[in-house]
Amino acid sequence: MIKSIRNLLYRPPAMPKSGEDFGDYQTNFVNAIRFTESCGFLVERPDWKPHERLEVEGSFLEPALRAAGVRDLTKAAFQCLKWSHYLAPHIEQQLGRKVWLTIGQIWKEDQALFSPTWNDLRSWSKQGITIEEMHKPGSAGLNLHAWLTVDSGEVIEPTMMTSIATLYPDTYSHFLCAIGWGQPADILSEHKYFPMAVGAEFAECLHSRSQIGLLASNPQELHSVPMAIVFGN
């Protein structure tokens, strides 16, 4: 009862209004867990291990992708939620450490590339996402970004670089099929991550209540592209 009352009374922190407003990623991540809990989902809290960083060589990736049945990374373009959710348990098993699906905003300098609000996420968790919502003026697809957070405080970015390469092949063809990992500020130059919701359960609820399938349960679904989810505002 007390927890239910706390969730009802919970008010999320202020949204960033510029690239200077992001603060500490780990603090924002814990705030995102608190918001997710207020929506009715259970999320394991992090026991941060900042000194146990991901290896620079990324040798964990190939066996994780192989176990996941990934055969064509170009299909990850514009499919951040589906790919991040699908890859999370495979990467977690390969690393032997906690990995969380993370949903939120991503900015380049002072411009939000994907900018869901707290109200958006809470509403989607209760009612799902409609096709009409994915075709709002000023948007072409699902206005959120998804990635993975590791218990070191680092992130793994499975899709953004391939999306950029697909949009701008003349300039960023070298990004195609690339996966990034490391400190949030180091993944992509001048890009910043703002976590807002955490965990597979939250994503699976969005999927089950939405008018379009958002996730994959097998490699065939992972590699299919029913709808391009591209840059929002």
State what each model feature region is.
Residues 1-233:
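A structural boundary/capping signal
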